[in-house]
């Protein structure tokens, strides 16, 4: 699938994981694909993880911030707090009203190549409440080699960093962990597949910022955000 928690060996090989690998060749990619794929992992009746190959690695880093946001939000709700925003690294849960007694305003950054994360220019602002929001993009964690850009989003189906027109994907869902996972998946899918998927799932809303043929920034919104 487009979202796969077994992608860690590939991320390491491309230099985006917890280990810094050398730039991989096609032979290495093919060998790593042999140990990539969620169908190679299952749960036993007593809840133990069963891997078809001991070299398979599981990494939930793509949803870690979203999960952490949900945990904090649940804690606040248990304490009886009804109006709040939790933000961890740009992944957000909002509940109730903001201090001005209106919907929460959440900005989406303009996806300009910015490895130092100093750009604060906004592409758009969402007005929402009682949702989880997550954004995934390829404009901060990347490098260039031989004049070609390689970003951190790895397609687990091919083993290579994605080369799509989508620059960032923002998802609104009932919880932040789900939004986080879908945002990553949409970055892997590419614009057309992501549009079809998002429009066919009315429980989600999504906003994609992409570059057209002239390199101009364009935006796609699901029907629920029109």
Feature annotation, model-predicted:
Residues 1-226:
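Mature catalytic core of soluble alpha/beta enzymes
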